[in-house]
Structures are given as C-alpha cells and as structure tokens.
Amino acid sequence: MKRNILALVVVVALISQSRPAESAGGTIIATLSKIPLSTLASALNTALETGASVASAAAAATSSDYSVTCVIEVENWTKHLMKYPVVQIANSGGLLTVAKNVLPAEIQSFAMRKAWGANGVYGTVSWVLGQTNRRVVIMWSAPYNFDFYSNWLAVGMSRPGLAVPSSRSTWFDLMYYGNSNADISFVRGEYYHSVDPIYFKNSEWEIEGSMNNIHKARVRATVKPIKTMDLASSILTKLEALAGANGKRAIQQELARRAEEEKQRKRKALDEMLK
C-alpha cells in the first residue's frame, strides 16, 4: 500500500514538473496526464526490481538483539546506476548488512545497529549517481533516548564534481546541525510526532525521503529524475504501453538510443581488452 502511494506521488510529480514545451518529454507527459493515476502507479510499481538486500536487511534488523536499529531502503527511478556506496557511521554503531549499488529501477537496503550502552546510531550514506560526478547523500539519526532526542532524516546531493565523501562525520555534522552550503544541498526533517516525507529538488533530480518515529527505525528514499527521459529504461518501457502513438514513438527512440549507446560501450570495452 505504501509503495502504491509512493508511485502515485512520483507520477504526479513527473506530470506536474515536466514542461509541455519539451518535444519528446512533453509528448509523453501530454499522453500520461490523460491516464488514471492508479493505472500509472500500478505500471510503475511493476517496473521495479526488489534486490535480495531488502529482505536480508529487514531480517537482520528484526532479529537483532540491539534495541536501536535502522534500515535504509533506496529506490532508484533514474536511468543511472547508483554506485560506490559509502556508509559513514558517525558514532560507534555498526553495520548489520552492507550497502550495495542500486541499479536503475531497483530497490536495495542495508541495516545498522547501535553500539553497546546508551547509544543510538547515526551517520550518512552516499552513492555516486551514474556519470553525473556527484553523490546522492542521506543523513539519518536514530537516538537511544526519545526523552531528549528524535529521529532525524536529511536527503540531498553534493555539487557536480564532488564525488568523494568528506571525513567520517563532516557531512553528518553539516546535515544534522547546519544548512546547505556550496558543497552539499539538502533538506532535513524531524520524525517525532510527524512522519511526513521530505523533498529535495534541484534542476535535474528529486529525492523523496521518509522515516518512522520508533527505535526500530526505517528510512525510505526515492531518487527520481525531473525529466521523463531520464527515467530508467524498464520504467519507460512500462510507460510506452500506456502512451499514445506519439508518446510511444518518443520512448522507442530514446530506448533505441540507449541500446546503441550500450552497444558502443561494450564494443569499446572489448577493443580495450584486445589491445
């Protein structure tokens, strides 16, 4: 149910954010805007592949003897691979499972736990987004004591050209205590009474994040493009089945372009191996 709601949010965002003036993208959006949102959401959900890490992270957190755990689940709706994950736990907590690359149209998770004693677990995790040379960054804080502290979440991106994380707690300190700067832009939310999602957006990408307000914390983040043509290929394929003639043609052209690009990449890699 929650994932259906999320898909509806994504569909509405794509339709509202894309400009009709865009030739190919505008043609697709004009077609999709006439289709019931529930139909679009169902199609988009079937395009997502759930990685094995989702079940293993949930199981690890559930079976853990530690009173504070945190599972972070990431959905990648873009055409880019989310790669080179870096988890930086800013206190003495530890990993229960490891963060993985997230393929286009894929869901992956990992889990963490608190250290011994009256401690929670907090830090950042980030991935390089394809060839954009920048990182998607998530900050979380799952405290031990709810009398004085709350769960907190921030989502954002590093600037283009900044693809290497700072030291262990630098990004956490900025995203928990501070504000966006020249290196990282983000939004932050407190999860004590409210569990409403937060939204980060720039000219190319949007990240939606949400967190619960219990000690078995769970973070969900969805990375999605502003432009329809930056959606993952499997999502575009699902949309192709729903689009009108002009929309189908635009999607088919984009998918063909990507297929040719991938063929050229493989050919180049083979040539390099044979040298």
From Swiss-Prot:
Cysteine disulfide links: none
Gene Ontology cellular component list: extracellular region; membrane; nematocyst; other organism cell membrane
Propeptide: 249-275
Any coiled-coil regions, as ranges: none
Keywords: Cytolysis, Ion transport, Membrane, Nematocyst, Secreted, Signal, Target cell membrane, Target membrane, Toxin, Transmembrane, Transport
Binding site for phosphocholine: 123, 141, 143, 176-177
Site (Important in the initial contact with the lipid membrane): residue numbering on this chain: 149
The keyword RNA-binding is assigned to this record: no
DNA repair in keyword set: no
Region (N-terminal region): 49-67
Cellular compartments annotated: Secreted; Nematocyst; Target cell membrane
Residues in the signal sequence: 1-23
Family: Belongs to the actinoporin family. Sea anemone subfamily.
Domain writeup: Composed of a long N-terminal alpha-helix and a core region rich in beta-sheet structures. Before the pore formation, the alpha-helix binds the lipid membrane, partitions into the lipid-water interface and stabilizes the monomeric molecule on the membrane. Finally, it traverses the bilayer, thus forming the transmembrane pore.
Stated name of the protein: Echotoxin-2
